[in-house]
A protein has these predicted regions:
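Hydrophobic/aromatic-rich core segments of domains that either
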Residues: 278-367
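Active-site nucleophilic cysteine motif
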Residues: 235-242, 271-287
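Sec-exported extracytoplasmic/periplasmic mature domains
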Residues: 25, 226-230, 244-252, 288, ...
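Well-ordered beta-sheet/strand-loop patches within structured domains
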Residues: 244-248, 280-281, 288-289, 311, ...
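Intrinsically disordered, low-complexity N-terminal segments that are enriched in acidic
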Residues: 2-187
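Acidic low-complexity segments
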Residues: 157-164, 169-270
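Terminal peptide-recognition signature
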Residues: 129, 242, 313
Length: 404
């Protein structure tokens, strides 16, 4: 664990100052202290010395509102292209829903190629890898077909869908898999006749319960959730209040490895920022505390030119069923209607690949050594006959081609 933390916290003050001064030339020790105190500049003492998170400097200009404005004045707003894609796509999805009243809409055919390349110089005989593979049990993800891969085992039994491969190690060892599938957008508007009753606590016990170490109804979680919800008693609107609040209050920032965090939702409350998975776990925890069934879903987002790992959630609303919620995409401020603004509360775009239906499960075949990522499963996992191979021992890459 110490090695993992050292890889994440590997910057000294002299390493991060050039980036900070690029956008904030007058920043001095007083500013640094203020940012550290507000947790906008993440650091940790290791062996008596202060080290900053490897992405602390870029994160500062995402977390601190003043710094964010200074950077935008120089570079422009982040991810403008993705916002344009999302706006056009949501408009198309809503138009199609209004015409058809189907919940699965605007399908795309995706061709996905994934690679893991092992570093040279390993002292081992065999490499075992688990690669991400699209789930077959999700209605909005269909027609899955393997296109190329040798000597593999496909696992659909676990909450983590994977393709397992092993081969003899040599320098430049690379594992590759290619598959295609159809992916749909999904949309569930609020029904006019929704009765706003609580879900069956016995039937959905698993999804309203605590699950250590990350889904714990601590006093902090209870107090924060209650302050967000206030006097609202309807489950749908309780969850929507949480959804609306989290993105406003906890800006997105690059995250340290989940395996180094004792309790992720508590970490978000303390640090006042989080990435997609951290915010989703906080959302799930808050919903479960209020007896709203909630569960994890994750994989990849496939927005053209913005492809990346991504996590989100689902909640169960009596009279609607399970509906998707993406807390990190949040309220769409450009929207002029409720449907546009709250699209990601009850809706999700078609640019997704679903790999995981929960977090922290077992891989198949079972991994012998500890996982590099013990919460999520997206980048893959690797091990030899004697030990786990952490992320610094290999590289992953992927290509996506979308066709409508």
């Amino acid at each position: 664990m110490e090695e993992r933390i050292l890889l994440d916290f590997n910057k000294k003050i002299e390493d991060i100052l050039p980036y900070i001064h690029k956008y904030y030339p007058d920043a001095d020790s007083t500013h640094i202290y203020k940012w550290e105190e507000s947790n906008a500049l993440e650091y940790k003492y290791i062996n008596g010395e202060k080290y900053y998170f490897k992405n602390a400097a870029p994160n500062l200009f995402r977390i601190d509102s003043t710094c964010k404005k200074l950077k935008e004045a120089v570079d422009g707003e982040e991810k403008v292209g993705r916002k344009k894609i999302i706006k056009e796509h949501i408009t198309e999805v809503l138009n199609e829903y209004n015409d058809t009243h189907n919940h699965l809409l605007t399908p795309y055919q995706a061709t996905f190629t994934y690679r893991i390349s092992i570093d040279n110089g390993m002292n081992c005989d065999t490499i075992k890898v688990w690669l991400p593979y699209p789930r077959e049990d999700c209605p909005r993800q269909t027609d899955i077909k393997l296109l190329s891969c040798n000597n593999f085992i496909i696992n659909q039994k676990s909450i983590h869908s994977s393709a397992y491969i092993e081969k003899k190690y040599h320098n430049n060892t690379t594992f590759k898999i290619k598959y295609k599938f159809t992916t749909y957008a999904e949309y569930h508007p609020l029904p006019n006749n929704l009765k706003h009753i609580a879900a069956d606590t016995i039937l959905f016990k698993e999804y309203i319960s605590e699950r250590a170490p990350h889904i714990i109804f601590s006093d902090k979680i209870k107090q924060k959730t209650d302050s967000i919800i206030g006097s609202e008693t309807r489950p749908y609107f309780q969850a929507r209040k949480i959804f609306e609040s989290l993105r406003k209050e906890y800006p997105w920032a690059s995250a340290r490895e989940y395996s180094t965090i004792d309790n992720i939702p508590e970490y978000v409350l303390e640090q006042k920022h989080g990435d997609c998975g951290q915010i989703s776990l906080l959302f799930i925890t808050m919903c479960r505390y209020k007896k709203i069934p909630a569960r994890w879903q994750s994989g990849f987002m496939l927005h053209p030119n913005y492809e990346n790992l991504h996590d989100w959630a689902e909640i169960y609303i009596e009279g609607m069923g399970w509906i998707p919620v993406d807390p990190s995409f949040g309220v769409q401020e450009w929207g002029t209607t409720e449907e546009e603004k709250y699209f990601y509360f009850g809706g999700i775009d078609a640019f997704r690949m679903i790999v995981n239906s929960d977090w922290g499960g077992e891989l198949h075949p079972k991994k012998i050594y500890s996982r590099s990522e013990n919460v999520d499963f997206q980048r893959g996992e690797c091990e030899t006959e004697t030990n786990n191979l952490y992320f610094n021992k290999w590289k992953y890459s992927f290509d996506v081609y979308l066709n409508k």
